[in-house]
A protein has these predicted regions:
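Conserved GNAT-fold acetyl-CoA-binding loop/helix
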Residues: 26-53
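Short secondary-structure boundary/capping segments
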Residues: 2, 55-58, 77-78
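Conserved N-terminal entry element of GNAT/NAT acetyltransferase domains
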Residues: 1-19
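A short helix-loop-beta-strand connector motif used in the catalytic cores of GNAT acetyltransferases and
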Residues: 49-66
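Hydrophobic "lid"/C-terminal helical patch
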Residues: 21, 25
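Conserved beta-hairpin
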Residues: 62-81
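Conserved acetyl-CoA binding element of GNAT-fold acetyltransferases
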Residues: 82-90
Length: 90
């Protein structure tokens, strides 16, 4: 299910989207959010988005993610944990 909005594609993430999405999330976090976090908080966030268990949950459908694309570049992502908890929104 893909939806085009203003020339952008919004769809459920596929396995191939995981690494580019996490990279975009990390870069965005560092640019806009990290200033408000302690070094420990920054490390914890990085560990969260690079955790193999999180990726495994995504592959099993227990951690759902949508991506917004401008062509082939991921420019946004939103994920849901446990089917009802917004986990990441970038």
């Amino acid at each position: 299910m893909a939806d085009m909005a203003n020339g952008y594609e919004i769809r459920w993430a596929e396995d191939k989207d995981w690494i580019p999405a996490m990279h975009m999330i990390w870069k965005t976090f560092l640019k806009y959010e990290a200033v408000d976090y302690t070094e420990e908080g920054i490390r914890n966030f990085h560990e969260f988005i690079t955790d193999e268990h999180l990726y495994k949950s995504f592959r099993q459908g227990r951690y759902q993610m949508m991506v917004a694309l401008d062509g082939v570049r991921i420019i946004g992502a939103a994920s849901v944990r446990s089917y009802n908890h917004l986990s990441l929104l970038f």
